[in-house]
């Protein structure tokens, strides 16, 4: 089975324009998304442009503030602090990773968690990791990381059982791997985090009923890493040796032995964008 995400994404986005209009009427202004654009990271900048355009189609005002390698840490920190307190800004997107000369922790500490729609601020991360079960995740103030949430929503949409299921997460980034592993554990999955230092990586992954890859390496996951009948979720966004957009998984070969697999593009990606858009609306609705 192909676990495409476009149907779920469309369902999430269906009523967002109407909700945005209600917010506009009650607040006396349209909701506003401000993104920090770092053109040196081409992929991140292109995705930000996509987010801004999708927000504008939903009835949300979009704005981009560009930074460069010459933007000092103090300047960046002041931008974040200003956006965090600006009552006309409802949501803020910050590039990941940030330029290396910036103090990442201090930036994420300064970002208002109620505007942090991608769930990357220190406070949002802390709140998430304090959650012991899924009810607490759903009730938490702020937001959980959007890509990790998109994976959970996609699994729920296809009614894939998680409780007690051995699930391997390949990747331990703060952006996806670690928060996703915790969110899966809140869904009662038995979670195994695998990474570059995991001994016998193939053996470890091939024991799992669900394999989720989020490492950013084109076609890294091959059929010998996945047991027959397992489900595979591909979070990766890469280009192969021919410049073709692809995921972490060798899709054409791995799909032959899986019971279910997400494609790239068209799998987790559309759901992530839908989650981000919904989070903008939620941020606005909390002010009503």
From Swiss-Prot:
Q: Which HAMAP family match?
A: THF_DHG_CYH
Q: Name one GO molecular function term.
A: methylenetetrahydrofolate dehydrogenase (NADP+) activity
**What is annotated about its quaternary structure and interactions?**
Homodimer.
Question: Can you supply a Gene Ontology BP term from the record?
Answer: purine nucleotide biosynthetic process
| CDD domains linked | NAD_bind_m-THF_DH_Cyclohyd
What role does this protein play? Catalyzes the oxidation of 5,10-methylenetetrahydrofolate to 5,10-methenyltetrahydrofolate and then the hydrolysis of 5,10-methenyltetrahydrofolate to 10-formyltetrahydrofolate.
Pfam families found in the cross-reference section:
THF_DHG_CYH, THF_DHG_CYH_C
Q: Which reaction does it catalyse?
A: (6R)-5,10-methylene-5,6,7,8-tetrahydrofolate + NADP(+) = (6R)-5,10-methenyltetrahydrofolate + NADPH; (6R)-5,10-methenyltetrahydrofolate + H2O = (6R)-10-formyltetrahydrofolate + H(+)
Q: Which UniProt keywords apply?
A: Amino-acid biosynthesis, Histidine biosynthesis, Hydrolase, Methionine biosynthesis, Multifunctional enzyme, NADP, One-carbon metabolism, Oxidoreductase, Purine biosynthesis
Q: Which family does it belong to?
A: Belongs to the tetrahydrofolate dehydrogenase/cyclohydrolase family.
Where NADP(+) binds, per the record, is at 171-173, 196, 237
Q: Which GO terms describe its cellular component?
A: cytosol
Q: Which InterPro entries match?
A: Aminoacid_DH-like_N_sf, NAD(P)-bd_dom_sf, THF_DH/CycHdrlase, THF_DH/CycHdrlase_cat_dom, THF_DH/CycHdrlase_NAD-bd_dom
The UniProt entry's coiled-coil ranges are: none
Q: Which PANTHER family match?
A: C-1-TETRAHYDROFOLATE SYNTHASE, CYTOPLASMIC, C-1-TETRAHYDROFOLATE SYNTHASE, CYTOPLASMIC-RELATED
The metabolic or biological pathway listed in the UniProt record of this protein is: One-carbon metabolism; tetrahydrofolate interconversion
Designated name of the protein? Bifunctional protein FolD
Lineage of source species: Bacteria, Pseudomonadati, Elusimicrobiota, Elusimicrobia, Elusimicrobiales
């Amino acid at each position: 089975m192909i676990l495409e995400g476009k149907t779920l994404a469309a369902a999430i986005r269906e009523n967002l324009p109407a909700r945005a209009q209600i917010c506009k009427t009650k607040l006396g202004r349209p909701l506003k998304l401000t993104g920090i654009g770092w053109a040196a990271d081409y992929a991140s900048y292109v995705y930000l442009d996509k987010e801004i355009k999708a927000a504008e189609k939903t009835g949300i005002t979009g704005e981009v503030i560009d930074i460069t390698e010459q933007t000092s840490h103090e300047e960046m920190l002041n931008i974040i602090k200003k956006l965090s307190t600006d009552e006309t800004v409802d949501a803020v997107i910050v590039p990941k990773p940030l330029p290396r000369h910036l103090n990442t922790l201090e930036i994420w500490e300064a970002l208002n968690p109620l505007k942090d729609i991608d769930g990357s601020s220190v406070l949002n991360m802390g709140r998430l990791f304090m959650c012991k079960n899924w009810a607490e995740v759903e009730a938490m103030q702020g937001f959980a990381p959007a890509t990790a949430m998109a994976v959970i929503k996609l699994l729920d949409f296809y009614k894939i059982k998680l409780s007690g299921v051995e699930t391997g997460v390949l990747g331990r980034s703060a952006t996806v791997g670690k928060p996703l592993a915790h969110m899966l554990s809140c869904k009662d999955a038995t979670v195994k985090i695998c990474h570059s230092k995991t001994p016998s990586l193939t053996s470890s992954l091939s024991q799992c009923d669900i394999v989720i890859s989020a490492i950013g390496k084109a076609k890294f996951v091959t059929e010998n890493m996945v047991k027959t009948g397992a489900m595979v979720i591909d979070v990766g966004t890469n280009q192969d040796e021919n410049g073709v957009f692809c995921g972490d998984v060798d899709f054409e070969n791995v799909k032959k032995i899986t019971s279910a697999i997400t494609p790239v593009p068209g799998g987790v990606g559309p759901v992530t964008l839908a989650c981000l858009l919904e989070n903008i609306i939620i941020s606005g609705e909390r002010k009503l």
